Amino acid sequence: MRLGVNIDHVAVLREARRVNDPDILQALYVACNSGADQITIHLREDRRHIQDSDVTNIMRHSSVPVNLECSINKEILNIIAQEKPHRATLVPEKREEVTTEGGLDLFSYEEDIGYAIELLHDSIIPVSLFVDPSIEMMEKAKDLGAEMVELHTGTFANLFAMLHSSLPHSDHSVKEYELPRYELSSRLEKSLEDLKNAAIHADKLGLEVAAGHGLNYHNVDQILQISEIVELNIGQSIVARSVFTGLADAVKEMKRLTSR
């Protein structure tokens, strides 16, 4: 299993005080030296964390492949095309969101996504699409010419947290999942089945399959049971763990878990 370490949240901490601390390049070096198979970053339209200069510097200095997440905004796409990352992952994006809230709607934005894929392919950049786990999305991703899909694991992660952590008793409880435990268990099982079925179908179509969003040290084991998934992109939980253990140990522990 490849581990993509997303270092966006290192930049979130830096931007909170508008200083160059923590240094994103130091985070890059530590992650690479601690077992990351890939570095993932998201250049958002609002530049709330990763900046254009970060992309250039990370591309220049990374010793492992760089997966660059981006929206289908043409200005952003042109930057990606110039930087030529090892892969571009197209994701949905809304300015008011705290984090990416769902998968890319390949049907509603088919024309724009098709344009984005063509532009990136013209620059010899493979494309992954961040999508919800459904058979229809897998088939549409294949039709659009993507090489890979990244399955959105947010629903699974939220259900797992509401069932197996203190999240329901916190200020950040997920209101739509404030349900009886038997209902949460049923929905969690269904979310895993959706992920498994989507991964199997994508694999049969010849698409590489990644997964990400909300994955952490407690829930990742269940995703590892889906053999068709070959890559996990994990960020916030690693950076959160690093506050207490240091980034090197946080990456090493996640690498150990995902290598089983």
Name these PLM-found stretches:
Residues 90-97, 148-161, 228-247:
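Glycine-rich phosphate-binding active-site loops on the catalytic face of alpha/beta enzymes
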Residues 73-84, 134-144, 211, 215-229:
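Catalytic cores of alpha/beta
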Residues 132-192, 198-201:
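Histidine/lysine/aspartate-rich catalytic loop segments that bind and position anionic ligands
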Residues 48-74, 108-128, 173-210, 254-259:
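Alpha-helix-loop-beta-strand connector modules within alpha/beta enzyme cores
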Residues 59, 102, 163-176, 184, ...:
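C-terminal helical cap(s) of enzyme catalytic domains, especially alpha/beta-barrels
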Residues 6-24, 65-72, 99-107, 124-133, ...:
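Active-site mouth loops of central-metabolism enzymes
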Residues 1-69, 74-75, 79-85, 143, ...:
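Conserved N-terminal beta1-alpha1 strand-loop-helix module at the mouth
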Residues 3-7, 39-41, 66-68, 88-90, ...:
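Hydrophobic faces of well-ordered beta-strands that scaffold small-molecule active sites
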